[in-house]
């Protein structure tokens, strides 16, 4: 059923469990098949076993995140039948059999929640739309049964697509508006989760910022654009957080990138590149210029050869995640894959 009925969206691994979202119907386009979270036992890392599923009122469960302590998960809702989009908070006391704590569907979230990031007692929600009432919402989840919106931010110009929070900084992938950096507790600009303060922003002409990864030790932010072909990942130098600058890029023909994961200890970035599969790139050292012309790609794989993206078959990589030395990949067409790096 996970493969035959529903397309697969994002995923998250924690401990011995993997969670995968869904992105609509394979057989009946427009139906409410993207309403399911699947739960997988990955105790045997190379042989995931489906143990449970949770259904919500949504046509798309685009994102799933697990809090670092493993006690709570959040899934996002878009296109609900009742028009009350938002999120569902899950109790992971038994991680293989999650239970619903509450569905949170405040009017502020009615356009739909596309992505989420959990940081301690706060959840950062990406609300669909390119109007001031959309953008970022910060949710206090210290009492998960009674979430409370405590802050909002809209960067103007275009819609917010994703948020990544680390070291008290929120990195907003704000499409044509660019990358926006907020202080949400770092101290660099006096911000907090309940009162975010903009630190800086950078826009790249012709580039739609889809997602970001901040690597603090290296002083870089990696940006993706899922629209333009040939696809390009940009590297932004943020050693001076108040003045980000473009440092490098990595380009591939034929498709656009989607999500990615950086193994910071090894200096390897794993880029999910839709029908082009997964590409592992050496991002160690100083990054300048066109990385694709510097022999930095160390491996790539199209694990489902043939077919096309969003089709009955064929590689259509959504997102990689490094977990216990393996690369877990969600694929729109074919579900969850487990890859072993061999370099």
Residues covered by each model-derived region:
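Feature marking well-ordered beta-strand scaffolds used for ligand recognition
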Residues: 1-343
């Amino acid at each position: 059923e996970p493969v035959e009925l529903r397309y697969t969206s994002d995923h998250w691994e924690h401990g011995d469990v993997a969670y995968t979202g869904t992105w609509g119907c394979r057989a009946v386009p427009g139906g409410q098949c993207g309403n399911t979270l699947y739960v997988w036992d990955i105790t045997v890392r190379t042989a995931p076993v489906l143990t449970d599923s949770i259904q919500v009122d949504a046509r798309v469960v685009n994102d799933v995140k697990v809090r670092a302590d493993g006690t709570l998960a959040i899934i996002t809702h878009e296109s609900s039948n009742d028009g009350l989009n938002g999120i569902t908070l899950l109790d992971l006391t038994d991680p293989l059999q999650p239970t619903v704590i509450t569905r949170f569907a405040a009017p502020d979230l009615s356009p739909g929640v596309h992505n989420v990031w959990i940081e301690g007692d706060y959840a950062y929600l990406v609300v669909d739309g390119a109007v001031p009432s959309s953008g970022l919402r910060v949710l206090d989840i210290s009492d998960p049964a009674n979430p409370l919106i405590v802050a909002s931010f809209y960067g103007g110009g275009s819609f917010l697509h994703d948020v990544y929070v680390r070291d008290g900084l929120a990195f907003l992938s704000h499409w044509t508006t660019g990358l926006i950096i907020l202080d949400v507790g770092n101290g660099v600009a006096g911000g907090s989760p309940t009162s975010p303060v903009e630190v800086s922003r950078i826009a790249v002409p012709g580039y739609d910022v889809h997602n970001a990864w901040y690597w603090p030790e290296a002083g870089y932010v990696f940006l993706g654009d899922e629209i333009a072909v040939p696809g390009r990942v940009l590297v932004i130098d943020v050693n001076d957080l108040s003045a980000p600058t473009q440092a490098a890029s990595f380009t591939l023909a034929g498709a656009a990138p989607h999500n990615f994961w950086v193994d910071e200890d090894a200096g390897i970035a794993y880029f999910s590149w839709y029908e082009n599969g997964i590409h592992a790139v050496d991002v160690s050292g100083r990054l300048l210029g066109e990385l694709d012309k510097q022999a930095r790609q160390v491996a790539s794989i199209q694990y489902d050869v043939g077919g096309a993206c969003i089709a009955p078959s064929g590689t259509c990589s959504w997102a990689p995640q490094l977990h216990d030395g393996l690369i877990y990949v969600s694929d729109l067409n074919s579900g969850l894959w487990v890859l072993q790096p061999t370099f």
